[in-house]
């Protein structure tokens, strides 16, 4: 099995909250695709609660588009990581990390402005696979934590696992 890019960085020294360019690629038609690691929690030390991350998934996708789309950028998808420590965001374009961090903070401020659980988008059995598993309170707690701690930038060259470590891990 090929080694995925996300497993070549050292999660023991990864900072959070932080933005990291996880991958860049060019389509056959020349479009630039960038995948960002939006790390909400320090790996193996913190985790987002399942109801909170699910609610955040519904809110974050729209709010990030409000603040980041335009000027050569269009978000394709924002999805939570299985480990519940962050989200991956795939987009067309190559915005710098600070632009992404600023949009992320603005989106978190928007989450804090949601006044009622009934205002969560697509919160019904037709549009959500587990529509009972939501918590606006938990999502807002996550958003407040991001704003209180601020968002930094994780650089791949600082997080790269040495080849010796990858060999030791039998990868």
From Swiss-Prot:
SUPFAM superfamilies: LuxS/MPP-like metallohydrolase (SSF63411). The keyword Signal does not apply. Its cofactor is Fe cation. Keywords: Autoinducer synthesis, Iron, Lyase, Metal-binding, Quorum sensing. It is an enzyme of class 4 (lyase). One of its GO terms (cellular component) is cytosol. It catalyses: S-(5-deoxy-D-ribos-5-yl)-L-homocysteine = (S)-4,5-dihydroxypentane-2,3-dione + L-homocysteine. Fe cation binds at residues 54, 58, 128. One of its GO terms (biological process) is quorum sensing. GO terms for molecular function: iron ion binding; S-ribosylhomocysteine lyase activity. Its EC number is 4.4.1.21. The keyword Calcium does not apply. Binds 1 Fe cation per subunit. Belongs to the LuxS family. PANTHER family: S-RIBOSYLHOMOCYSTEINE LYASE (PTHR35799:SF1). Homodimer. This is S-ribosylhomocysteine lyase. It comes from Yersinia pestis.
